[in-house]
């Protein structure tokens, strides 16, 4: 893994690990109602990652705001696209200029050793193999499909440390998928978002564990 040179990050920063897609600066997060169950159902992976992103017309865009409710966190930055993580539908929605682009995703049930990018157990490796199998299968029928590996953390810790850790974990998953399972590098990108998009900004420890997550988002 190549070294990450990180000195200072602004509030809405990210670490680009591999092949960057467009970067959002606003977020709406719909929190899950249940705790993630391991291992990930192969049917869920197949359904989500075989569904291509789509563009729809935004009929009503909420006014820019910053607020927190029991299930939703809204952080808007004027002049920037709004990004929505909807865990009920498992889609990332990017809203800009009257259009909404929906990108299906799966949350990987992978665990890492505390404070590191090293995979913790065999279940994590099995989950990555399941994802690799689906991506390879989809690539045969849709050669242009592309997926982004997103690393996220909880709000616990410093922004700089969380940014570096999320980038390292996204890169770790990227390396396993490309090197161990043969996913073409042209089909993947990787980003670390740190604590930019928490599901539970003021959550307890159990909730913050769900924020320490890695997503595979179909971007094309």
Where does each model-flagged region fall?
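Short, surface-exposed beta-strand segments enriched in small/polar/acidic residues
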Residues: 106-115, 134-169, 188-200
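Short, solvent-exposed beta-strand/turn patches at coil↔beta or beta↔helix junctions
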Residues: 83, 89-137, 154-160
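Periplasmic peptidoglycan-binding/anchoring modules of Gram-negative envelope and division proteins
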Residues: 116-150, 174-179, 216-220
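N-terminal targeting leaders that direct proteins to extracytoplasmic destinations
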Residues: 1-102
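A broad, structural micro-motif
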Residues: 102-104, 165, 183
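Periplasmic OmpA/Pal-like peptidoglycan-binding modules at the C-termini of bacterial envelope proteins
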Residues: 14-56, 171, 175-220
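Alpha-helix N-capping/helix-start residues
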Residues: 121-122, 167, 185
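Short coil/turn motifs at beta-sheet boundaries
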Residues: 103, 142, 207-209
